[in-house]
Amino acid sequence: MSSKNIKTNVARFLQKKGVKFGLIPYEVDENDLGAEHVAESLSENVEQVFKTIVLHGDKSGYIVGVLPGNHEIDLKKLAKVSGNKKCEPLPLKDLLPTTGYIRGGCSPIGMKKKFQTYIHTTVNSFPYVFVSAGVRGVQLKISPVDLIEQTEAVVADIVYEDKNESII
């Protein structure tokens, strides 16, 4: 699949806004949709391949966490920064109807509705990062500044420091 022939809703959205980005295809493994596999397929640093997790806060409703592929979301930290007492990952069956995206193809840009987004602080450590382009098999290469701006995200510490504490 040539990156010149790829068109996704995310790409159309960003083109309309005049945002610079790249679309990078990769081979999908239906048995491993994780960010570590994506990073390996792209020959990129897994710290730069960010995954998108949709959650539900007890006060805020739906929220989005965007974090490096080799880290796990800390639900307590995310709840605190988002003004919730607790938050829980969205059940997989609710992902498509809520966001318009499927597992392994969920982009923080261009969801059906605008949800408050929180991106982990390490996003600013890189000249560019990767997030899903809205379909399996295509990653969006974008500057952290543009990603934050287009998602209207809050940058915050939302991951476990010790991977042994993780649940997701």
Regions found by a protein language model. Give the residues of each.
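Extended, low-hydrophobicity, polar/charged segments
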Residues: M1-I168
